């Protein structure tokens, strides 16, 4: 995805774009900071900040008071460093063959999930000639990534020796919730207790973690008892409710997906639209062509199921969504719509446009998937904090 800097002219009319409201990011970080109490906020900007652009989001989050940044992979962390980010950055997912040396050289904190990874990090630190900052990721019930209880004692042994040798600095202990979006689920408390117990066990065996963190977005907003010294929100940074049934939870969605109307044309009753003529006009009407399709992140499964906001009115998509384009029914009285007018596919919803949550419900998925889908030819433009479209 291409990115334009704040305040640059909009992309050519043939292009779709996501407009990212950095003021919303700023607002959301401040909401999360207040809810976190004395705990720090680690802003998760993995996957290119959930499709919002890692560098602009990272800068905004740090300016709003986030203490650190979290990403999945080392290349994501290094991209932040190359972009001038000097704040603490933690990377926690490492495929086989990962070279940890560049991360250590760039002062990127590395989370390890096994004895093997820890030994690789220690070896890389010796190679670089620099102390590595390490967090231990433990499995407290998700059964995904992380050191299990059975392997934890031997990992602590390696950790203690490496720390004594000056190869590593032991920074944190982290885990991830199974039922974060179900705040009252008793398993959340069990995971919190397991993490606390593993911290105590480590201290009794010569390893003292500086911080522990467990809370994702929903827990950061609803379970202050599980905050430890740091919370690790992701989706809430971008203004999407981590518990949709609770409403917006005081958050402001940051992403709007839009494109210009590329063509306006009239059709007669009985005329079919797009591949297979799955939609046939039941009256004389006017159609609008939108230059965005499934190659750009508009799911083909949404064919004939979504509305698009044009000139303050919702217009229904008709016919098949194609690779590069789809068609909307503007209605027989569409004299107000012209080529170049904005078509809002989804956004915050404040002006009646569909939202990412609307798409998620139609697709039987989550809004995380929706906002990470715009890609390829979709350009990205930013509204600085304090400016609205």
Swiss-Prot record:
- Keyword Nucleotide-binding in annotation: no
Needs which cofactor? Answer: pyridoxal 5'-phosphate
Which SMART domains does this one have?
Ala_racemase_C
Q: In which pathway does it act?
A: Amino-acid biosynthesis; D-alanine biosynthesis; D-alanine from L-alanine: step 1/1
The record's top EC class is isomerase
For the keyword Isomerase, the answer is yes
One Gene Ontology term of the molecular function aspect: alanine racemase activity
Which EC numbers does the record give?
5.1.1.1
Q: Which reaction does it catalyse?
A: L-alanine = D-alanine
- Which family does the similarity line name? Belongs to the alanine racemase family.
Function of the molecule: Catalyzes the interconversion of L-alanine and D-alanine. Overexpression due to a natural mutation in the promoter is responsible for mediating resistance to D-cycloserine (DCS) in mycobacteria.
Protein known as = Alanine racemase
The species this protein belongs to is Mycolicibacterium smegmatis
What is the gene name?
A: alr
């Amino acid at each position: 995805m291409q990115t334009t800097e704040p305040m640059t002219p909009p992309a050519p009319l043939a292009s779709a774009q996501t407009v990212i409201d950095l003021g919303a990011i700023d607002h959301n970080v401040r909401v999360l900071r207040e809810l976190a109490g004395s705990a720090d906020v680690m802003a998760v900007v993995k996957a290119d900040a959930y499709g919002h652009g890692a560098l602009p989001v990272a800068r905004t989050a740090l300016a709003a008071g986030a203490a650190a940044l979290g990403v999945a992979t080392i290349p994501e962390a290094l991209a932040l460093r190359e972009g001038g980010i000097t704040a603490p950055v933690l990377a926690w997912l490492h495929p086989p063959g990962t070279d940890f040396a560049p991360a250590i050289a760039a002062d990127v904190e590395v989370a390890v999930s096994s004895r093997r990874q820890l030994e690789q990090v220690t070896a890389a630190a010796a190679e670089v000639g620099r102390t590595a900052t390490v967090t231990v990721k433990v499995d407290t019930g998700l059964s995904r990534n992380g050191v299990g209880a059975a392997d934890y004692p031997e990992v602590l042994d390696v950790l203690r020796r490496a720390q004594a040798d000056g190869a590593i600095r032991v920074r944190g202990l982290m885990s991830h919730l199974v039922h974060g979006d179900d705040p009252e689920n008793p398993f959340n408390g069990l995971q919190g207790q397991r993490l606390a117990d593993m911290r105590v066990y480590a201290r009794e065996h010569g390893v003292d973690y500086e911080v522990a963190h467990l809370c994702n977005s929903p827990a950061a907003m609803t379970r202050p008892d599980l905050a430890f010294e740091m919370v690790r929100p992701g989706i809430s940074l971008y203004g999407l409710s981590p518990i949709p049934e609770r409403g917006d939870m005081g958050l402001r969605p940051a992403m709007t997906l839009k494109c210009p109307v590329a063509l306006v044309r009239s059709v007669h009753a009985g005329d079919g639209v797009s591949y297979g003529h799955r939609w046939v006009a039941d009256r004389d009407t006017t159609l609008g062509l939108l230059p965005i399709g499934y190659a750009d992140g508009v799911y083909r499964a949404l064919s004939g199921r979504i509305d698009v906001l044009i000139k303050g009115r919702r217009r229904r998509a008709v016919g098949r969504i194609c690779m590069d384009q789809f068609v909307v029914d503007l209605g027989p009285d569409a004299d107000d719509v012209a080529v170049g007018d904005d078509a809002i596919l989804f956004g915050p919803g404040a002006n009646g446009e569909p939202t990412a949550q609307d798409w998620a419900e139609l697709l039987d998925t989550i809004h995380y998937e929706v906002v990470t889908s715009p890609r390829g030819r979709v350009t990205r433009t930013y509204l600085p904090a304090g400016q609205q479209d």
